[in-house]
Amino acid sequence: MSDVSGDGDLSATVTEHEVTPQPPVSSATYPSLTVSASYKESSGGKSSSKRRPIRPSFDAAADNEFITLLHGSDPVKVELNRLENEVRDKDRELGEANAEIKALRLSERQREKAVEELTEELTKLDEKLKLTESILESKNLEIKKINEEKKASMAAQFAAEATLRRVHAAQKDDDMPPIEAILAPLEAELKLARSEIGKLQEDNRALDRLTKSKEAALLEAERTVEAAMAKAAMVDDLQNKNQELMKQIEICQEENKILDRMHRQKVAEVEKLTQTVRELEEAVLAGGAAANAVRDYQRKFQEMNEERKTLDRELARAKVTANRVATVVANEWKDGNDKVMPVKQWLEERRFLQGEMQQLRDKLAITDRAAKSEAQLKEKFQLRLKVLEETLRGTSSSATRNTPEARSMSNGPSRRQSLGGAENLQKFTSNGALSKKAPASQMRHSLSINSTSVLKNAKGTSKSFDGGTRSVDRGKALLNGPGNYSFNKATDDSKEAESGNGWKENSEEKPQSEDPEAATEDSVPGVLYDLLQKEVVSLRKASNEKDQSLKDKDDAIEMLAKKVETLTKAMEVEAKKMRREVAAMEKEVAAMRVEKDQDARAKRFSNSKSPSNTAQILAGRAAGRSGGLTKSTQ
């Protein structure tokens, strides 16, 4: 983008690959200015080459530092790029969170399957417990039968002793057969009964041991059942907690969707604002071209006024010299006492000297006002620079880290161009101050126009990384198209004004007609810049709040994942304990089965022996009875 400076020279345009300086309009020599276009990021993804700016030589280093503070990359686009990167990171984090949620769901399904297997094992253990209880009941019945048999054997023993007593009593009374013959079978029966009683006592002891072991096994089984019930309750609690966590995750996802919608709305609003800013920049550039043309005309007009004033002065001097020559010629024939300057000549010389003194006073007043206005503008610029430094400190630091070379190559010439524009405008004010009848209001308007034009140049040169070349192309189009049109139009208007009204009317009417337009053009960018600054601050706050909410959600997800991990570990430990208990129960059941088989075999063996013993006892009893009968018959 090439701008027309206040003194009439065109600054050189620097594109991506070549530098095309344009010739100056006037014959005066001024330092050539350059504008460096920033690196553009094209849609095809091509990387732009390095630019070769032409660096002008300035003497004042303080002015360079002052203008370098005015320049900077576009904060809105940098902030938008940063927000888009953050949104992508958050989307990536959401994808990871969804993957973790899927993994947690799979782990929950596996836990449910494990719980179902444990419930099946518990049902099997309950069935085994019922079987053991039925076996214990059968054993108790057998123990009762054995006790009854024991009581019957004791009763038989008491009956045998009673018979022995009777036999002894009968021997005393009557002559009986020998007692040994009668007692031998009875003693044999007693021995058999005692042996059976000992076996039954051993069986009772073994059954007592079995009952105690069964009771201990039942107690352990009850404990395992209680533990399994507690685990089932824990599993239910875990399922409820998992459902609550799933609900919370869904709520967080809905909140994320709402935040994404809000972010999209903010991005759309920022895009609209950037579009309006671009349109306003285009309008400002168009107004700048027209303003440059108007400044050229004003400068030419002031030069012509100065020439007219010099001609008037020369005419007055010529008149004075002519009058003096006339007086000298007239006084040649007079005496020394009669040689007196005429009153008309003295009045003209006095008027001429008073006019020159008034011009000098006007110049002093104008320079004082210009110095005061420049001091005020400097204070305003310093305040604006402080605000810009505070707002753009974070974004500019990130941007300078990424592209320090691009910043160093693109900032210097553009800032120097804005500095050159300010110097040219100051020269313009100093040249314009030479006019004789310029009022204080016109000087104030011109100073305000010059200050705002400095800001325009600074804003125009501060191109962003994306739209730098676009602004260059727009500046070229504006200078080639509407700039020439406004220039020609201004020349036609000036010719008509000169033909109609003359020098004084043009000098008074042109600034009055151009001041409100310049004021309106200059007041718009500041308001829009403040609005954009407020929007950037609000977007930063929203992004910070969103980051904080996402961090809280990530912390909650991490806590939930830790809880799930601890629960899974507890479930694994409990499953291992259950497996160990089930293995121990199976071993005990196998041992009980072996003992039961041994008991059944022992019972079968005892049952096979008992018929033979009873047959022997009955045979002995029958023989004793037959012997007694024979003795009684004898």
UniProtKB/Swiss-Prot annotation:
Q: Where is this region: Required for targeting to microtubules?
A: 258-494
Q: Compositional bias (Low complexity) at which positions?
A: 36-47
A Gene Ontology biological process in which this protein takes part is: cytoskeleton organization
Entry GO terms, CC? cytoplasm; microtubule
What keywords are assigned to this protein? Coiled coil, Cytoplasm, Cytoskeleton, Microtubule
Region spans: Disordered: 1-57, 393-526, 594-634
For this protein, the record's InterPro entries field holds: MAP70
Q: Does the keyword Coiled coil apply?
A: yes
Sample GO molecular function, one term: microtubule binding
Residues in coiled coil: 74-392, 532-601
For bias kind Polar residues, which ranges apply? Answer: 25-35, 393-417, 443-464, 605-616
Q: Primary place of residence?
A: cytoplasm
The record's subcellular locations are: Cytoplasm, Cytoskeleton
Tell me, what does this protein do in biology?
Plant-specific protein that interact with microtubules.
Indicate the family of this protein. Answer: Belongs to the MAP70 family.
This protein's name: Microtubule-associated protein 70-2
Which source organism does the UniProt entry give? Arabidopsis thaliana
Species lineage, top-down? Eukaryota, Viridiplantae, Streptophyta, Embryophyta, Tracheophyta
Q: Which gene encodes it?
A: MAP70.2
